[in-house]
C-alpha cells in the first residue's frame, strides 16, 4: 500500500535521529496528538450544540402548535413530534456521556458495535442533511482490545471525511467483521466520493497535509490533522490502517485492531 510504504520510510528516518533530536520529536508528537484530541473534542461540542438547538426548536414549535389547536388529531401529531425529538436528545446525551466517561488512554476489551452506534447517532443529522445513504453491516464479533474513545474519534473523522468527499445523495458503506485467522477486528469504511489521486496517497498521512482547500460549509476539515491523528491512534493500538482510492470511484479505509483474548 502506498500510504503504508511512506509511513515506513518516515519511521526509518526517525530511527536514524540522534537521541536528543529523537526526544524532541517524541515531545512534539505528543503535543500534536493532544492538539488533535482537542480539535476533535471541539468539533464534537459544536456538532452536539447544533443538534440540541435543532431539537429545542422542534419541541418549542410543536408545543406552540399543540397549544394553539384544540383538535385531538393535531395535538396527537404535535405530541408525537415532541416525543421523537426528546428521544433523539436522550440518544445524543448517552453518546456524549459515553465519550465523557472514557477520557483515559486505557486499552481494554471493548464492544466496538456500541462505539459505532454512538458515532452514528452524532452524525445522523449531518448525513441526512446531505442525503447520504449509509449502509452498515455489523457482524456479531468478540470484543476488541482498544480505547473506545480514541477509536470513536477515528470513526467520526473517517465518516466526516467520507461525507465531505461525496456529492449530494452518495453512499457510505460501513462494515464490522472478525478475522478469525489473524484474530483481528476488521472495520471498513468506503465511500462513493471523488477519490484521492494516486500521487497524493503517499502524503495523506503526513501532519498538516490536506487534499481539501479548507474547512467546508460546516466548518470541518482542511487542517490536515485528521488522518495523521487516526493513523497514530491505530498504530498505538498495534493495529493497521490500509487506504485504497480511485479518482471518480471513491475511497476505502480498512482498519485492523487486535481482538481481545477470551477470559
Model-identified regions with their sequence ranges:
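Amphipathic alpha-helical coiled-coil "transmission" helices that mediate dimerization
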Residues: 1-36
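Generic alpha-helical structural signal
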Residues: 3-6, 22, 44, 55, ...
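Short, charge-rich amphipathic segments
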Residues: 17-27, 46-57
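Core catalytic ATP-binding domain of two-component histidine kinases
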Residues: 46, 52-263
Amino acid at each position: 500500500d502506498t500510504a503504508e510504504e511512506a509511513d515506513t520510510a518516515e519511521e526509518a528516518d526517525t530511527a536514524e535521529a540522534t537521541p536528543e533530536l529523537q526526544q524532541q520529536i517524541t515531545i512534539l508528537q505528543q503535543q500534536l496528538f493532544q492538539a488533535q484530541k482537542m480539535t476533535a473534542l471541539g468539533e464534537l461540542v459544536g456538532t452536539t450544540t447544533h443538534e440540541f438547538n435543532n431539537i429545542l426548536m422542534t419541541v418549542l414549535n410543536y408545543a406552540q402548535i399543540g397549544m394553539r389547536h384544540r383538535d385531538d388529531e393535531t395535538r396527537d401529531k404535535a405530541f408525537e413530534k415532541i416525543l421523537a425529538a426528546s428521544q433523539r436528545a436522550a440518544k445524543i446525551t448517552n453518546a456524549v456521556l459515553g465519550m465523557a466517561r472514557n477520557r483515559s488512554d486505557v486499552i481494554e476489551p471493548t464492544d466496538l458495535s456500541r462505539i459505532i452506534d454512538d458515532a452514528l447517532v452524532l452524525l445522523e443529522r449531518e448525513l441526512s442533511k446531505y442525503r447520504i445513504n449509509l449502509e452498515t453491516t455489523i457482524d456479531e464479533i468478540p470484543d476488541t482490545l482498544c480505547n473506545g474513545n480514541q477509536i470513536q474519534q477515528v470513526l467520526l473523522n473517517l465518516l466526516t471525511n467520507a461525507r465531505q468527499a461525496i456529492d449530494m445523495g452518495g453512499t457510505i458503506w460501513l462494515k464490522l467483521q472478525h478475522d478469525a485467522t489473524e484474530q483481528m477486528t476488521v472495520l471498513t469504511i468506503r465511500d462513493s466520493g471523488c477519490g484521492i489521486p494516486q500521487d497524493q496517497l503517499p502524503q495523506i498521512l503526513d501532519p498538516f497535509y490536506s487534499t481539501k482547500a479548507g474547512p467546508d460549509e460546516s466548518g470541518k476539515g482542511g487542517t490536515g490533522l485528521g488522518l495523521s491523528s487516526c493513523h497514530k491512534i491505530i498504530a498505538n493500538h498495534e493495529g493497521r490502517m490500509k487506504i485504497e482510492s480511485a479518482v471518480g470511484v471513491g475511497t476505502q479505509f480498512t482498519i485492523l485492531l487486535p481482538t481481545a483474548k477470551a477470559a
